[in-house]
Amino acid sequence: MTIRNQRFSLLKQPIYSTLNQHLIDYPTPSNLSYWWGFGSLAGICLVIQIVTGVFLAMHYTPHVDLAFNSVEHIMRDVEGGWLLRYMHANGASMFFIVVYLHIFRGLYYASYSSPREFVWCLGVVIFLLMIVTAFIGYVLPWGQMSFWGATVITSLASAIPVVGDTIVTWLWGGFSVDNATLNRFFSLHYLLPFILVGASLLHLAALHQYGSNNPLGVHSEMDKIAFYPYFYVKDLVGWVAFAIFFSIWIFFAPNVLGHPDNYIPANPMSTPPHIVPEWYFLPIYAILRSIPDKAGGVAAIALVFISLLALPFFKEMYVRSSSFRPIYQGIFWLLLADCLLLGWIGCQPVEAPFVTIGQISSVFFFLFFAITPILGRVGRGIPKYYTDETHRTGSFWP
């Protein structure tokens, strides 16, 4: 190839060379398992949500008198509208399933540890943005659960000292959840996914600065292979499995993950017997309800994200992977069971014994983050590969 041809080659252009560096020639540890495929699946879910959301917005009307009917118009009159709506509604659930698995994989293999602190913190920010985006999106159909869910959750801001009531009034655009609230939520719901894209790109760039973690929790620059074609094929298998799983929900059980009360138009004069959020909010909602005081519940929710953000800054552990840490491994599986229990408690009535079970489960949830630094020092004697300040070398802890 001549110098002139090299200059005008597509692969030599900055954007293509960047894509080639991060998606094709990206050096990847050779022992990655299928658990490392959820990052790309999360990206696919985000693209699905944006594409379907843009088309749904073309037919949606953000007005309290027309929102519910416009959703029904999409379902009944727009060609393929039912598919767009079911893909978008169930796509949110799939997105959270993938991200929850991604988070628990990171906890199991300690992917938050040095030098990937920034990667983990960006991931927590993305998770928080997802929660906000999904919540305001749940309000848009303007059904009973949409209206009352918005009323209950936004009212939590009143627990903030001094400025709480002002924030609630600003969120509502008035003195109750009404048309101004719906318009604000629609605007934010359209904007936030694009902010999520930017945060995801930063997350990917931060990850590729130091490379991916691996099941052994060791660091090595030698035992790496190109992402394409080796791990691209492994990811492709995961994409096909995800497409099948996603299709089952869309075509055979499109409303199972939703709430039947949301097929009733919003009525400010009639409160549902039991107000519950979408299933992916239930563990956090259970923690919120486990504390009778509103301010305490809001503080507990804030502590959930503070605990996640603080994980990378605990003292460095001797061994990263839970494969070599049986004590931590047992505690991790208890945490997973605890989160599932919190999810179940979140959809139960606020009465005994569910309140007590929720309080015990919430205590264990925070206890996990409290004892993680201690467990990180257990397991001395397991080999750890580290990076010397002057040169990369393999070594073991004595």
From Swiss-Prot:
Residues reported in the UniProt entry to bind heme b b562: H88, H189
Residues that bind heme b b566: H102, H203
Recorded GO CC terms: mitochondrial inner membrane; respiratory chain complex III
Keyword Transmembrane helix found: yes
Cofactor: heme b
List of residues binding a ubiquinone: H208
Domain of life: Eukaryota
Membrane-traversing stretches: 38-58, 82-104, 119-139, 185-205, 231-251, 295-315, 327-347, 354-373
UniProt-listed InterPro entries: Cyt_b/b6_C, Cyt_b/b6_C_sf, Cyt_b/b6_N, Cytb/b6-like_sf, Cytochrome_b, Cytochrome_b_C_euk/bac, Cytochrome_b_N_euk/bac, Di-haem_cyt_TM
One term of GO molecular function: metal ion binding
Subcellular location: Mitochondrion inner membrane
Pfam families linked: Cytochrom_B_C (PF00032), Cytochrome_B (PF00033)
Membrane topology: Multi-pass membrane protein
Keyword set, alphabetical order: Electron transport, Heme, Iron, Membrane, Metal-binding, Mitochondrion, Mitochondrion inner membrane, Respiratory chain, Transmembrane, Transmembrane helix, Transport, Ubiquinone
Record keyword Membrane present: yes
GO biological process: respiratory electron transport chain
Cofactor binding notes: Binds 2 heme b groups non-covalently.
Function (record text): Component of the ubiquinol-cytochrome c reductase complex (complex III or cytochrome b-c1 complex) that is part of the mitochondrial respiratory chain. The b-c1 complex mediates electron transfer from ubiquinol to cytochrome c. Contributes to the generation of a proton gradient across the mitochondrial membrane that is then used for ATP synthesis.
PANTHER family, A to Z: CYTOCHROME B
Other comment: Heme 1 (or BL or b562) is low-potential and absorbs at about 562 nm, and heme 2 (or BH or b566) is high-potential and absorbs at about 566 nm.
UniProt family annotation: Belongs to the cytochrome b family.
Subunit structure: The main subunits of complex b-c1 are: cytochrome b, cytochrome c1 and the Rieske protein.
Protein name as catalogued: Cytochrome b
Biological classification of the source: Eukaryota, Viridiplantae, Streptophyta, Embryophyta, Tracheophyta
